């Protein structure tokens, strides 16, 4: 399970663009907590503390417990808005969750055991299509990553989404469950050799057909 993050916050009564700019000048970030059948709550959080959390690499798929003036609220980050030039955080949306809440999150995928793949040993390249998997999972059971073994894969073999083992209680949120997650492709040199062999085979077949035709013409 991914780590739970803790963030201090204060309620905010001010709203609107002017109020948000004033909040940012104070070194704070305006944010909102919504969901779980409760009214939305406007808050402010410290920009530096939030920036550190963003740099953990798993902020968007972690439970963030927000302490709002002593009231601790478990949430999931749903959207982060950045300044287009400075990359400063402008606003954050947090979804309030409970122990039984089902959430949709993007989980990073780690592909392992490349040294056990015959195709990769022969020079094949692991072409990764899905670096993340979208899962529906309980908020209290969000995995930190999904580990996928490529052991035994030959050149041309693929792993599909529906072949990946998921944590108990989790399910894919992708529309196409049979789409390819990763495949072992032939390197350019191997492709060239295969093409050359195919061309040679075609040339030999054409030559043989021509010889047979000539023999047939002679016999006539």
Swiss-Prot record:
GO terms for molecular function: 5S rRNA binding; structural constituent of ribosome. It comes from the Bacteria. One of its GO terms (biological process) is translation. Disulfide bonds: none annotated. Belongs to the bacterial ribosomal protein bL25 family. CTC subfamily. This is one of the proteins that binds to the 5S RNA in the ribosome where it forms part of the central protuberance. Part of the 50S ribosomal subunit; part of the 5S rRNA/L5/L18/L25 subcomplex. Contacts the 5S rRNA. Binds to the 5S rRNA independently of L5 and L18. This is Large ribosomal subunit protein bL25. It comes from Zymomonas mobilis subsp. mobilis (strain ATCC 31821 / ZM4 / CP4).
């Amino acid at each position: 399970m991914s780590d739970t993050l803790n963030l201090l916050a204060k309620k905010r009564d001010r709203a609107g663009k002017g109020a948000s700019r004033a909040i940012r000048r104070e070194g704070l970030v305006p944010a909102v907590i919504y969901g779980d059948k409760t009214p939305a709550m406007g808050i402010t959080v410290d920009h530096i503390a939030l920036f550190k959390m963003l740099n953990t690499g798993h902020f968007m798929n972690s439970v963030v417990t927000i302490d709002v003036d002593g009231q601790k609220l478990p949430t999931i980050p749903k959207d982060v808005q950045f300044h287009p030039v400075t990359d400063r955080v402008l606003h954050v949306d947090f979804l309030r969750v409970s122990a039984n809440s089902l959430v949709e999150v993007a989980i990073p995928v780690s592909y392992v055991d490349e040294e056990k793949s015959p195709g990769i040993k022969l020079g094949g390249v692991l072409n990764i299509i899905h670096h993340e998997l979208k899962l529906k999972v309980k908020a209290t059971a969000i995995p930190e990553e999904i580990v996928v073994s490529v052991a035994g894969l030959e050149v041309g073999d693929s792993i599909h989404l529906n072949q990946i083992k998921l944590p108990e209680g989790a399910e894919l949120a992708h529309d196409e469950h049979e789409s390819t997650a990763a495949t072992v492709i032939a390197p350019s040199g191997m492709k060239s050799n295969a093409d050359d062999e195919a061309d040679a085979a075609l040339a030999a077949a054409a030559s043989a057909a021509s010889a047979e035709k000539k023999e047939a013409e002679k016999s006539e």
